[in-house]
From Swiss-Prot:
<feature type="region of interest" description="Disordered">
    <location>
        <begin position="188"/>
        <end position="244"/>
    </location>
</feature>
<comment type="subunit">
    <text>Interacts (via SH2 domain) with Rho GTPase-activating protein DLC1 (via C-terminus); the interaction is independent of DLC1 tyrosine phosphorylation. Interacts with integrin ITGB1; the interaction displaces tensin TNS3 from the ITGB1 cytoplasmic tail and promotes ITGB1 stability. Interacts (via SH2 domain) with E3 ubiquitin-protein ligase CBL (phosphorylated on 'Tyr-781'); the interaction is enhanced in the presence of EGF and reduces interaction of CBL with EGFR.</text>
</comment>
<feature type="compositionally biased region" description="Low complexity">
    <location>
        <begin position="208"/>
        <end position="219"/>
    </location>
</feature>
<keyword id="KW-0963">Cytoplasm</keyword>
<keyword id="KW-0965">Cell junction</keyword>
<feature type="compositionally biased region" description="Polar residues">
    <location>
        <begin position="367"/>
        <end position="393"/>
    </location>
</feature>
<feature type="domain" description="SH2">
    <location>
        <begin position="451"/>
        <end position="558"/>
    </location>
</feature>
<comment type="similarity">
    <text>Belongs to the PTEN phosphatase protein family.</text>
</comment>
<dbReference type="GO" id="GO:0008104">
    <property type="term" value="P:protein localization"/>
</dbReference>
<dbReference type="InterPro" id="IPR000980">
    <property type="entry name" value="SH2"/>
</dbReference>
<comment type="function">
    <text>Promotes EGF-induced cell migration by displacing tensin TNS3 from the cytoplasmic tail of integrin ITGB1 which results in dissociation of TNS3 from focal adhesions, disassembly of actin stress fibers and initiation of cell migration. Suppresses ligand-induced degradation of EGFR by reducing EGFR ubiquitination in the presence of EGF. Increases MET protein stability by inhibiting MET endocytosis and subsequent lysosomal degradation which leads to increased cell survival, proliferation and migration.</text>
</comment>
<feature type="modified residue" description="Phosphoserine">
    <location>
        <position position="230"/>
    </location>
</feature>
<protein>
    <recommendedName>
        <fullName>Tensin-4</fullName>
    </recommendedName>
</protein>
<dbReference type="InterPro" id="IPR006020">
    <property type="entry name" value="PTB/PI_dom"/>
</dbReference>
<dbReference type="GO" id="GO:0005925">
    <property type="term" value="C:focal adhesion"/>
</dbReference>
<feature type="compositionally biased region" description="Polar residues">
    <location>
        <begin position="306"/>
        <end position="316"/>
    </location>
</feature>
<keyword id="KW-0732">Signal</keyword>
Length: 718
């Protein structure tokens, strides 16, 4: 043995017979910390300090430890002799248990160097038949034995096959290798979660082999070699199904559970839910071990286990017997948890990605693949109508502990493990309104050509709604508010609490509203409780469902209103059809003067004289002067004096120019003055003359005067 072998540490080799005996029957030590697990092919447990477990050879343990220390000192003093006769001397002198070796290591200088695994010579080969058969089956496999010496806290994996914590759960058996290499100085990427640990690795009959650091800190490979008469039997196909994920990744995941170390070893349900516990290999515990006797995995419900032969390549029928452990196959839910941290104490299934805990996942590790049967099951559940209906009625905060294999199971689980929310009506289809004719945005936008007439006038809107049912409406561009809209609505009857305003035609039960447009959206003017809507279609859609500030809900028309042609909203057609019954222009409103019982041209002349004789002339206001067969409507463009005033045709007496041809010259060019005489709204026995001046030469007042005169003549004839 070369002297370079002893530069950074000590190499101790055991006889093949003795190592095989100790590997199969290790003896626990009372000198190790409280949470130092040991394992054999028959049992699994921990050694608490207050209750140490002694074996038959415990009486000679002190003598063996002293002999081991003396021999180790001899090896340190005589490195040359050890190199020359290492094989013969070690085989004949060293005879002590694994626990005595651990005690000796704790007392020695803890500065060990990582030695290449290929230094082990042929003398490291085991001679027993079990190891020989394993060597033939897996010539390239490397056995790892991981024993924690001083552990400060628990760091456990949630993966069913990997663990880097002091509570190592070996899937099937203890290592069966010859050479033992002791080291502490392990590369950072391959170091386990605890800084002070011992790693025992063996090389099966290879003179030199490349170092495989990924296996040192991540996993203990599953081996199929078992002693005859062992109470645990490895199912066929299990080894190959589990080796790939064990050796393929170096990423270790920290446990999010706040419980102690021993809870993970004994399978406490405070650290892992039943679905996660069922995913661990059952043969790592025996019925006679302390772990299984104390917790027994909390008696998982056997009837609720979802057994699939394609999930973990195990027989579909679990072995349920008193002499053999129950084989609990991993469920699809548990497989999905293998890529994230264990669920919390509340059994919440919200996964925490590995990248949030340990950084980036290993790029070489393949993503978890679902079996074809599980994919079909997921697809069938997702497309099941009953499953979709059940999901919309309740919101589950915690998934059930039993795997769900059918929509009926899902129904039962959601009823017993969820907080039910009130039933919410389903949204109607966007193509057409629902059964109760509740419209949708698409339906409102598709029918906008029937209810949105931007070019029609107020009188045209009234004519369209005159013969329609209550709730019918039409929206047009406002002539007084630029950018706003006018809403004309047919109501059943005028509410008693809402008095008639000027401009409302009470005889036809048609009311008019202004829909303002601003940066916030469209809003019904004068209704503070009304929200702002992003578009006119949204305004109509909401008010067709709820009336809000309107007298009634809007009824969206599905045909042309009033039996008109589809092109009735064109400007040319509208002007032609209403040319004889309406006229309008912008004028300057001056003032209103009471003329007592006068009427005709004399009333206009007297009113102008009274106005001009005042010390302070009135301030003019631009208004829209509209004449229809129903009367005269004045709309203040700037809303300075009034909003809108309506004078019915039956209240009009006269309309004409100033007989003296006087002109108005304040704040504008000289313009002609005219006015109309109507019945006073405050004094029923008197008349009032309302004076105006032409605002624009392109809009002369002669047109509106002629129309009012013609309408008055028609009224006198009747």
């Amino acid at each position: 043995m070369s002297s370079s072998l002893l530069t950074g540490g000590h190499v101790v080799s055991l006889t093949p017979h003795e190592e095989s005996r100790m590997a199969l029957h290790p003896t626990p030590s009372h000198d190790l910390p409280a949470l130092c697990p040991y394992y054999t092919t028959e049992s699994w447990g921990t050694q608490p300090l207050m209750d140490p477990t002694l074996c038959k050879g415990s009486s000679n343990r002190l003598q063996q430890a002293q002999q081991a220390e003396a021999r180790a000192q001899c090896l340190l003093q005589c490195p040359g002799e050890q190199a020359s006769g290492a094989s013969q001397d070690l085989d004949s002198c060293i005879d002590f248990s694994l626990e005595a070796l651990n005690k000796m290591i704790l007392e020695l200088d803890p500065t060990f160097q990582l030695l290449p695994s290929g230094i082990a010579g042929p003398q490291a080969e085991p001679t027993n038949s079990v190891a020989s058969r394993t060597k033939k089956e897996e010539p390239d496999a490397l056995d790892i034995k991981y024993i924690e010496v001083t552990s400060t806290r628990s760091r456990c994996l949630d993966s069913p096959q990997r663990c880097s914590s002091p509570c190592v759960t070996p899937p099937f058996g203890s290592p069966r290798s010859g050479g033992l290499f002791l080291s502490r100085d392990i590369p950072r990427e391959t170091r386990s979660s605890s800084n002070e640990s011992l790693i025992f690795s063996g090389n099966q009959g290879r003179g030199s082999s490349p170092h495989t650091p990924s296996s040192l800190s991540n996993s203990i490979p599953c081996r199929e070699s078992r002693a005859s008469g062992s109470p645990l039997a490895t199912p066929p196909g299990w080894e190959k199904g589990l080796r790939a994920p064990q050796w393929g990744s170096r990423v270790s995941t920290l446990s999010a559970s706040p419980v102690s170390d021993i809870s993970y070893v004994f399978g406490s349900n405070q650290s892992l839910p039943h679905s996660s516990l069922s995913s661990y290999p059952p043969s790592s515990r025996s019925l006679g071990s302390p772990a299984s006797s104390s917790s027994s995995l909390h008696s998982l419900d056997r009837g609720s286990q979802c057994v699939r032969s394609s999930d973990a390549q195990v027989p579909s029928n679990p072995i349920v017997g008193m002499g053999q452990p129950q084989a609990v196959p991993s469920t699809p839910v548990a497989k999905e948890q293998a890529s994230s941290c264990p669920p919390s104490v509340t059994n919440s299934m919200a996964d925490i990605p590995i990248v949030l805990i340990n950084g980036n996942p290993e790029p070489q590790s393949p993503p978890a693949q679902q079996t074809p049967r599980y994919q079909d099951s997921v697809q069938s559940r997702a497309t099941s109508p009953s499953h979709l209906c059940q999901a919309t009625k309740s919101h589950s905060k915690t998934l059930p502990d039993v795997p769900l294999t059918s929509p009926s199971h899902l129904c039962q689980a959601t009823k017993s493990h969820s907080k039910t929310l009130p039933d919410v009506p389903l949204t109607a289809s966007p193509e057409s309104p629902a059964k109760d004719m509740q419209p949708t945005m698409k339906f409102v936008m598709d029918t906008s050509k029937y209810w949105f007439k931007p070019s029609i006038t107020r009188e045209q809107a009234i004519n369209l709604l005159r013969t329609e049912k209550p709730g019918t409406f039409v929206i047009r561009d406002s002539s007084s508010y630029r950018g706003s809209f006018g809403l004309a609505l047919k109501v059943q009857e005028t509410p008693a609490s809402a008095p008639n305003r000027p401009g409302e035609d009470s005889t036809d039960f048609i009311r008019h509203f202004l829909v303002e447009s601003s940066a916030k959206g469209v809003h019904l003017k004068g209704a503070d409780e009304e929200p702002y809507f992003g578009s006119l279609s949204a305004f109509v859609c909401q008010h067709s469902i709820m009336a809000l500030a309107l007298p009634c809900k809007l009824t969206i028309p599905q045909k042309e209103l009033g039996g008109a042609e589809p092109a009735s909203d064109s400007p040319t057609h509208g002007q032609t059809s209403c040319l004889k019954i309406s006229a309008g222009c912008h004028t300057l409103y001056l003032t209103s003067v009471s003329v007592e019982t006068l009427s005709g041209a004399l009333a206009v002349q007297k009113a102008i004289s009274v106005m001009l004789e005042r010390d302070v002339l009135p301030t003019p206001t631009v208004v829209h002067f509209k004449v229809t067969e129903q009367g005269i409507t004045l709309t203040d463009v700037q809303r300075k004096v009034f909003f809108r005033r309506h004078y019915p045709l039956i209240a009009l007496r006269f309309c004409g120019m100033d007989p003296e041809q006087r002109k108005w010259q304040k704040y504008c060019k000289p313009s002609r003055i005219f006015g109309f005489v109507a019945k006073s709204q405050t004094e029923p026995q008197e008349n009032a003359c309302h004076l105006f001046a032409e605002y624009d030469a392109a809009q002369p007042a002669s047109q509106v005067i002629s129309l009012v005169t013609a309408l008055l003549k028609d009224t006198e004839r009747v």
